[in-house]
Amino acid sequence: VGEAFWSAEEQK
């Protein structure tokens, strides 16, 4: 859960 959100934040 929250992996998709973290993926976007990781690319930041």
From Swiss-Prot:
- What is the official name of this protein in its record? Unknown protein 5
